[in-house]
Amino acid sequence: MNLHEYQAKQIFAQYRLPVSKGIVCHSLDDAVSAIHTLAGDTWAAKCQVHAGGRGKAGGVKLVRSEAEIREFCNQWLGQRLVTFQTDKNGQPVNTIYLEETCLIERELYLGAVIDRSSQKIVFMASNAGGMNIEDVAAQTPELIHKATIDPLTGAQAFQGRELAFKLGLSGDQIKQFAHLFVQLAKLFIEKDLALLEVNPLVLTKQGQLLCLDAKMVIDSNALYRHPELKALQDPSQEDAREADAAKWDLNYVALDGNIGCMVNGAGLAMGTMDIVKLHGGRPANFLDVGGGATKERVSEAFKLILSDQNVKAVLVNIFGGIVRCDLIAEGIIAAVNEVGINIPVIVRLEGTNAELGREILANSSLRLIAANTLTQAAQLAVKAAEGK
């Protein structure tokens, strides 16, 4: 689960991490009032969306007057911000975060992720702050310095000092960085995070380290023990179909293609999407109904696919290991009868009760196209989506 920048910074403050003073604004009046409360004569206005690349998209701007903040709010509040991390529709801007600015001497990067191979937390630090860390890793990997944290023992101050030396910090800056490093690691572990980023972490002209941006991604599997974090969830930033899918324990990710895919098993789902792409098609979604699919879940999955107006054909690829193909067939029939359908549906069933499943579909009087192999199914789906 993603958090907004202002939410992450509020949590940062609880862990005694240095952040700028800011005010959350939900309306133009809030923003105008905020600039009279915050110090200084220049403020950073930031659109709050669950996506990176806000600055390049115009969603972050320095404002120096009431007129400028009015212009910024009128431009973005209630609108959608499109960045390189969003789809073509962008994310809705319901909140603007207005905060005090500082004079910057240097921009650094500090982030943490889970290394699943070693089952440890890896911190990454770099002098290339303010940049896309993926680009830095690809083009200049020598600029990234790492420290590995055992979650059972936590971060050690000496690890923070070692990173500080590599970043070229000196004097009191090293002490500040070590404190920041240890506290971020504590936050990462205690809040069950999957990702943590401070980009940029700046060194001000006064020699103080400051978290100028903050990104937190919480492991959704751990939310049951963090109700205070669950309460921070912003449904407006999530795809409505993905939210509906979660209610039925369906793994759904919306894409921009025109061939709906319903598959059981994440690996098979990705393989199905690859085969569709190989034959010139464009998947409209990733949808894994899971190994314990019931008739009801399959029905909901089918309705979910058909709710996408861009879908011109549906490819159902089921391998019956745990799940029974006859249940899948009954779910498809139930969904089609309930929702109605006027697009081709290609079905490939293999495994447990596959013959029975095919028989159920054949006797349903529905317009379904049977496929014997995955390659044939993909080819039929691509042709159907093209109207051939």
Curated annotation (Swiss-Prot):
Belongs to the succinate/malate CoA ligase beta subunit family. Its cofactor is Mg(2+). GO terms for biological process: succinyl-CoA metabolic process; tricarboxylic acid cycle. Substrate binds at N264, G321, I322, V323. Its EC number is 6.2.1.5. ATP binds at K46, G53, R54, G55, E99, C102, E107. One of its GO terms (cellular component) is cytosol. Heterotetramer of two alpha and two beta subunits. Mg(2+) binds at N199, D213. Succinyl-CoA synthetase functions in the citric acid cycle (TCA), coupling the hydrolysis of succinyl-CoA to the synthesis of either ATP or GTP and thus represents the only step of substrate-level phosphorylation in the TCA. The beta subunit provides nucleotide specificity of the enzyme and binds the substrate succinate, while the binding sites for coenzyme A and phosphate are found in the alpha subunit. Pathway: Carbohydrate metabolism; tricarboxylic acid cycle; succinate from succinyl-CoA (ligase route): step 1/1. HAMAP family: Succ_CoA_beta (MF_00558). InterPro entries: ATP-grasp_succ-CoA_synth-type, ATP_grasp_subdomain_1, Succ-CoA_synthase_bsu_CS, SUCC_ACL_C, Succ_CoA_ligase-like_bsu, Succinyl-CoA_synth-like. It comes from the Bacteria. This is Succinate--CoA ligase [ADP-forming] subunit beta. Keywords: ATP-binding, Ligase, Magnesium, Metal-binding, Nucleotide-binding, Tricarboxylic acid cycle. It catalyses: succinate + ATP + CoA = succinyl-CoA + ADP + phosphate; GTP + succinate + CoA = succinyl-CoA + GDP + phosphate. It comes from Actinobacillus pleuropneumoniae serotype 7 (strain AP76). The keyword DNA damage does not apply. GO terms for molecular function: ATP binding; magnesium ion binding; succinate-CoA ligase (ADP-forming) activity; succinate-CoA ligase (GDP-forming) activity. Binds 1 Mg(2+) ion per subunit.
